[in-house]
């Protein structure tokens, strides 16, 4: 099917998609022109067919019910309007299909503050505690699952569009 990665960055997740029998067309969107440039170079070097687009997760430039799967790995904690981004991911997903949203949890954020120079400054000195945004999911989504991955440093919210 047709899959969209929101905030594709340099394309580090693409090797997990390319060549899978259940993945046909791959789309990627990022707000950063620099990240998209790196991703385009990576995709060209690998010889992959990936449709890349500059855009904002809070206003996805795709038609309703376009994708068989949508995922976002990292970044939603810094979005201006998390609810709008989640609503947009739902909007562009076909009914009955899955959406996956992951980002660092509080444990991960604290670890990043210890090991990544400048992370605390980026996140803000008095940043609020990181809480998975399950409260922002609309009531009509189904099969909501919240779990941790990557040494329990990241949360993942997986659900199905009604």
What are these regions (language model features)?
Residues 58-70:
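A short acidic, Gly/Pro-enriched loop at the edge of an enzyme's catalytic core
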Residues 30-31, 81, 104:
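Short beta->alpha hinge that forms the Motif I/post-I loop of the SAM-binding pocket
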Residues 100-158:
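C-terminal alpha-helical "lid/dimerization" subdomain adjacent to the S-adenosyl-L-methionine
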Residues 20-21, 79, 93:
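A generic alpha-to-beta junction signature in SAM-dependent methyltransferases
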Residues 68-81:
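A short SAM/SAH-binding and catalytic strip from SAM-dependent methyltransferases
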Residues 2-59:
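Class I SAM-dependent methyltransferase SAM/SAH-binding core
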Residues 2, 97-98:
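Short glycine-centered segments of the SAM/dcSAM-binding site in methyltransferase folds
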Residues 83-95:
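A short glycine-rich, Lys/Arg-flanked "PGG" loop and its adjoining helix->strand segment in the class I
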């Amino acid at each position: 099917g047709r899959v969209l990665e929101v905030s594709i960055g340099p394309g580090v997740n693409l090797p997990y998609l390319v060549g899978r029998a259940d993945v046909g067309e791959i789309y990627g969107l990022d707000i950063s022109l620099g990240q998209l440039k790196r991703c385009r170079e990576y995709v060209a070097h690998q010889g992959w067919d990936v449709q890349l687009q500059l855009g904002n997760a809070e206003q996805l430039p795709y038609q309703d019910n376009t994708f068989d799967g949508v995922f976002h790995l990292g970044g939603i904690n810094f979005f201006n309007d998390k609810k709008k981004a989640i609503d947009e991911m739902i909007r562009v997903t076909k009914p009955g299909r899955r959406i996956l949203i992951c980002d660092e949890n509080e444990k991960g954020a604290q670890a990043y503050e210890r090991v990544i120079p400048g992370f605390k400054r980026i996140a803000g000195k008095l940043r609020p505690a990181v809480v998975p945004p399950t409260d922002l999911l609309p009531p009509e989504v189904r099969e909501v699952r919240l779990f941790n991955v990557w040494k329990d440093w990241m949360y993942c919210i997986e659900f199905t569009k009604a």
